Amino acid sequence: MDIKLISQERAEDLNMPNEAFELFGKLNVQRLDQQWDYSIHYFEESKWDVFPDESYDWQQVMTQGFALGAYVDEQLLGLAIFQDDWKKFMYLHDLKVTQAFRKNGVAAELIKKGHELALERGYRGIYTIGQDNNLAACRFYLK
């Protein structure tokens, strides 16, 4: 697998379609005694959801940060978009992996490379925001 910066020649890769993901539980975050903690609530029934497709503009993405693609034999498997921020951490704006390649380390490799590039830009690291009802994503980000 190759992790590459999305070039202008591959700008169409920024509009990788979103695919469905399973909603099977919720992460409940709390702060007790000056310590962060969380608990997990599993839904009685899971359901599937999909985000609307984005329409990213390559020039705008590059002006605000950078984008990485994960490729095998030039096939796009995953996408990560990072944005500059006024904080000391770069923002992971979007992360997606095709269903067929999820749980194979694609997202982790995209984040690893994004973290390296963020450090090169003078950031201390990266951060993101996750939806509490997307338990698979929340658990992934906790690793």
Whereabouts are the PLM-identified features?
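Conserved GNAT acetyl-CoA-binding A-motif
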Residues: 118-130
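Conserved acetyl-CoA-binding loop-helix of GNAT-fold acetyltransferases
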Residues: 97, 103-116, 142-143
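Short loop/turn motifs at secondary-structure junctions
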Residues: 2, 91, 122-124
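Conserved catalytic-core motifs of GNAT/GCN5-like acyltransferases
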Residues: 29, 129-130, 142-143
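Ligand-binding pocket scaffold of soluble enzyme catalytic domains
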Residues: 3, 15, 36, 111, ...
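Acetyl-CoA-dependent GNAT
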Residues: 8-12, 16-89, 93, 98, ...
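Conserved active-site alpha-helix within GNAT-family acetyltransferase domains
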Residues: 108, 120, 133-143
